[in-house]
């Protein structure tokens, strides 16, 4: 079972639908409707922290869920979830120089883990005004994808099964409508 922490974002259910198409049965809780103890009692196979309209500090139990599950279950953060992972492990989330709402960018990646087998570069759809500051990235995290301008679009923990993507794999514009976004989510389910 995939536990989804919903940060009150309309894109969350696009992700849920994609995971359903991949044969997963997501269990969805709003970030103010479940405690860490309740989540641990569910004993999910993996956890996803969803996008959302705020900062990690305003994302309900998202940071606490990362603390509870990192190293115990595979964990994926998308957009706000990605920022929450960066912040939890010691990075700084800052206002982006360019607001990217409904815009696409070419993203280069390492072709490993969640990016395995994806086009490189791939087209990624972005909806964010915050990002993880590259200079603040702690030693335990590594950049797995970035824009030509050096903005972090993917990160991974060096020792734990924790990944984040700043962009939206569920967007139809990601990978120019190709299978890349779905493949990224499928890769997560296999890790």
Regions picked out by a protein language model, each given a short descriptive name:
Residues 82:
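Catalytic nucleophile loop
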Residues 2-22:
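Short, charged N-terminal beta->alpha structural module
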Residues 85:
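Local cysteine-cluster metal-coordination motifs and their immediate loop/turn environment
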Residues 2-4, 11, 28, 33-44, ...:
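Amide-donor transfer/coupling interface in amidating biosynthetic enzymes
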Residues 23-27:
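A generic structural motif
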């Amino acid at each position: 079972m995939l536990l989804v922490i919903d940060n009150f974002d309309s894109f969350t259910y696009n992700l849920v639908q994609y995971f359903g198409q991949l044969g997963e049965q997501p269990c969805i809780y709003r970030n103010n409707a479940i405690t860490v103890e309740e989540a641990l009692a569910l004993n999910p196979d993996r956890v996803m922290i969803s996008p959302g309209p705020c900062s990690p500090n305003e994302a309900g139990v998202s940071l606490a869920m990362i603390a509870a599950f990192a190293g115990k279950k595979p964990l994926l953060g998308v957009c706000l979830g990605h920022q929450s992972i960066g912040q939890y492990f010691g990075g700084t989330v800052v206002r982006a120089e360019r607001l990217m709402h409904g815009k696409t960018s070419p993203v280069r990646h390492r072709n490993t883990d969640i990016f395995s087998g994806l086009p490189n570069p791939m087209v990624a759809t972005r909806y964010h005004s915050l990002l993880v500051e590259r200079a603040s990235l702690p030693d335990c995290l590594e950049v797995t994808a970035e824009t030509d301008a050096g903005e972090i679009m993917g990160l991974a923990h060096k020792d734990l099964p924790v990944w984040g993507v700043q962009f939206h794999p569920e967007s139809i514009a990601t990978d120019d409508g190709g299978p890349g976004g779905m493949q990224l989510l499928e890769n997560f389910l296999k890790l």
